[in-house]
């Protein structure tokens, strides 16, 4: 009888195991097919391994010798600034590696509140709220703020995190053509029937280096009773006279309602994001923003690094001026050599090449010459608009800039991108 039960159990288990194995095999087949389609489309993203700290000069696994890095968001060079590193170490030692908690349980330390207050002062806003990343700040904002009675109007080339955040909310969604103020006005007219109208835009767009026309956006928002939201991830710390961002650059700091930005680019490059704006909005986000409520607090070391980075910025704008001068040096030399550089005078300098294979080949040959840049093609950018995105840092030397231009000219001629 015992043997019969064992046999019955074994027989009943066999079909279940077979079905499980069949489901796993099906999953593997689906995944391999999807991965192969990515490879076939030429959009596979490989990850080069850096074996040194981040900075203008790095070591890359598989590349001989030192490499000059021109593809980091390290606009001010603060990720390796000795005072920023020391601040992170001090905070780590005093406040520990992490909080093991969300903010509203036992995850708020004095350093979190101090940094939020410092961010609000920096942007001249009432209050600020920290998130693990700006992606979280963007996915948390719209759902918490907007209801089905409201409308959000978004630039078509906004960052993926803004797009995802808008998808999560119940507001009516309008998309206007990139930087097209006539189209935005038409959409604002159409959205007049809604309770709140929020215009959402990047301050500086990461693929093209162009800047949102905030003066015109704010004028239209005022005319049609709308609020203005700006993501300043590629502007905070270095655009504007004191690095406050595109709203300072364009003289509309008092007209932009909400700013989201990051601590993971110019402000030390560790991690973290934030929303800053009206105090009542920040209070609402603390109660309703899901990425804030259900994510661990920002680690103390990251808080310490970002706080010191802001101190350095508020003490002097010398590094901001240095980055601007080096950006101008690169752009002017590249244009004089015959390259087309997209965007305004922004440290994101897209070298427009058009052909995806050409962009990939030039980037590979640049690395062989000790210059680390990345090529971008469809679907990251439109078809026929492939480019190499060069990013300038305040800690690049003039010699670094000149060497990069020389390599571009040499490789460009080799591949027929220059005569």
Curated annotation (Swiss-Prot):
Keywords: Acetylation, Acyltransferase, Mitochondrion, Nucleus, Pyridoxal phosphate, Transferase, Transit peptide. The keyword Iron does not apply. PROSITE patterns: AA_TRANSFER_CLASS_2. GO terms for biological process: biosynthetic process; L-threonine catabolic process to glycine. One of its GO terms (molecular function) is glycine C-acetyltransferase activity. Pathway: Amino-acid degradation; L-threonine degradation via oxydo-reductase pathway; glycine from L-threonine: step 2/2. Substrate binds at residues 159, 389. Its EC number is 2.3.1.29. Its cofactor is pyridoxal 5'-phosphate. This is 2-amino-3-ketobutyrate coenzyme A ligase, mitochondrial. The gene is GCAT.
């Amino acid at each position: 009888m015992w043997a019969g039960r064992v046999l019955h159990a074994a027989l009943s288990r066999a079909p279940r195991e077979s079905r499980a194995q069949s489901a796993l095999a099906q999953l593997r087949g689906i995944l391999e097919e999807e991965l192969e389609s990515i490879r076939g489309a030429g959009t596979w993203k490989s990850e080069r391994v850096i074996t040194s700290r981040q900075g203008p000069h790095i070591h890359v696994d598989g590349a001989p010798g030192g490499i000059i890095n021109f593809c980091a968001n390290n606009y001010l060079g603060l990720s390796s600034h000795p005072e920023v590193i020391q601040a992170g170490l001090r905070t780590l030692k005093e406040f520990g590696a992490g909080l093991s908690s969300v903010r509203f349980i036992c995850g708020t330390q004095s350093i979190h509140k101090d940094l939020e207050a410092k961010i609000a002062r920096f942007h001249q806003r009432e209050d600020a709220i920290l998130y693990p990343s700006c992606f979280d700040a963007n996915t948390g904002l719209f759902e918490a703020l907007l209801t089905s009675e409201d409308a959000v109007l978004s630039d078509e080339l906004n960052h993926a995190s803004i797009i995802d955040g808008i998808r999560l909310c119940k507001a009516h969604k309008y998309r206007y053509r990139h930087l097209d103020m006539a189209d935005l006005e038409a959409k604002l007219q159409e959205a007049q029937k809604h309770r709140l109208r929020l215009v959402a835009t990047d301050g500086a767009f990461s693929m093209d280096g162009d800047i949102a026309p905030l003066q015109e956006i704010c004028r239209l928002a005022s005319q049609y009773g709308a609020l203005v939201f700006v993501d300043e991830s590629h502007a905070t710390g270095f655009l504007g006279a004191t690095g406050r961002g595109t709203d300072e650059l364009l003289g509309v700091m008092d007209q932009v309602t909400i700013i989201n930005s990051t601590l993971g680019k110019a402000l030390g490059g560790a991690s973290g994001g934030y929303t800053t704006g009206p105090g009542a909005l920040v209070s609402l986000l603390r109660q309703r923003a899901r990425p804030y409520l259900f994510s661990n607090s920002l680690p103390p070391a990251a808080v310490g690094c970002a706080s010191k980075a802001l101190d350095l910025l508020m003490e002097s704008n010398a590094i901001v001026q240095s980055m601007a001068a080096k950006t101008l040096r690169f752009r002017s030399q590249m244009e004089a050599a015959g390259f087309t550089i997209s965007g305004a005078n922004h440290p994101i300098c897209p070298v427009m090449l058009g052909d995806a294979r050409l962009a990939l080949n030039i980037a590979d040959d640049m690395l062989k010459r000790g210059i680390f840049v990345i090529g971008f093609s469809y679907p990251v950018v439109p078809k026929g608009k492939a480019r190499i995105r060069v990013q300038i840092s305040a800690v690049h030397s003039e010699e670094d800039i000149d060497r990069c231009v020389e390599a571009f000219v040499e490789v460009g001629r080799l591949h027929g991108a220059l005569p």
